[in-house]
């Protein structure tokens, strides 16, 4: 299960080409879905438009549960993008993985902590940006001293904890799913080195657990996309609300 990643050194930095490939694939898929479901908008929507409208309404309800919809409308596009991108990213490595030699080329991008933590840092940074933009730097800074100035160190720790848990929760769930699928796949194929019959028995015996775990991983990937989007809006609400 130990795989290497193809990397390239550029300007003194090391870039993971596998991650770059999978991020690009996920982005292209989300872009294509958005284009195909909105290119022919009409009053009497078809199935594709209904699908996108359902996603938008779903995200709108998420936002409405965390903040005033008038204010939350500013974050609707962010929420839809996050939900779709993370869901697609979670699903990419579910049906299969591609390994060339010892190098892994196809997997879920969210099965890498560098990507999930980057997403977490990005959304938490956005919450700070909008907090300052909508409340002003002076008023926003006072939130870190409420209800008493002694809370300041705790507020700083909370920010780091929120960022880490947001990213590592997503990574842990998706990575664990892919690891178990890989173990089941190895179980199905390793017996072929002994005999074809044992290999066939191993393959048949692993099919049902693999299908069951793939179905469970589909559920987990969907839930994790929802949780990440929901927590993003919760953090955003805390930063822009005048009650915090």
Swiss-Prot record:
Compartment list: Cell membrane
- UniProt keyword Chaperone present: no
Q: Which Gene3D superfamilies match?
A: ATP synthase, F0 complex, subunit A
The record's listing under InterPro entries reads: ATP_syn_F0_a_bact/chloroplast, ATP_synth_F0_asu, ATP_synth_F0_asu_AS, F0_ATP_A_sf
Indicate the principal place this protein occupies in or around the cell: membrane
Instruction: Output the superkingdom of the source species.
Output: Bacteria
Q: Which UniProt keywords apply?
A: ATP synthesis, Cell membrane, CF(0), Hydrogen ion transport, Ion transport, Membrane, Transmembrane, Transmembrane helix, Transport
Q: Name the Gene Ontology biological process terms.
A: proton motive force-driven plasma membrane ATP synthesis
Q: Can you say what this protein is called?
A: ATP synthase subunit a
Source organism per entry reads Bacillus velezensis (strain DSM 23117 / BGSC 10A6 / LMG 26770 / FZB42) (Bacillus amyloliquefaciens subsp. plantarum)
Phylogenetic classification of the source organism: Bacteria, Bacillati, Bacillota, Bacilli, Bacillales
């Amino acid at each position: 299960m130990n795989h290497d990643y193809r990397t390239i050194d550029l300007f003194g930095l090391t870039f993971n080409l596998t991650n770059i490939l999978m991020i690009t694939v996920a982005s292209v898929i989300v872009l294509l879905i958005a284009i195909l479901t909105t290119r022919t908008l009409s009053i009497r929507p078809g199935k594709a438009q209904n699908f996108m409208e359902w996603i938008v309404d779903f995200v709108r309800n998420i936002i409405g549960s965390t903040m005033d919809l008038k204010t939350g409308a500013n974050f609707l596009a962010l929420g839809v993008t996050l939900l779709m991108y993370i869901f697609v990213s979670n699903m990419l490595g579910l049906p299969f993985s591609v390994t060339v030699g010892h190098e892994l080329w196809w997997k879920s991008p969210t099965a890498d902590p560098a990507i999930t933590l980057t997403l977490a840092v990005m959304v938490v940074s956005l919450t700070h940006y909008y907090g300052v933009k909508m409340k002003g730097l002076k008023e926003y800074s006072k939130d870190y001293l409420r209800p008493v100035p002694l809370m300041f160190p705790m507020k700083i720790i909370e920010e780091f904890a929120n960022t880490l848990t947001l990213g590592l929760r997503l990574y842990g769930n998706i990575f664990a799913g892919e690891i178990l699928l890989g173990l089941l796949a190895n179980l199905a194929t390793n017996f072929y080195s002994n005999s074809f019959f044992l290999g066939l028995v191993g393959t048949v015996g692993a099919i049902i657990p693999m299908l069951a775990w793939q179905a469970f991983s589909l559920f987990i990937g969907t839930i994790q996309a929802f949780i990440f989007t929901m927590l993003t809006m919760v953090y955003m609400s805390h930063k822009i609300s005048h009650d915090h």
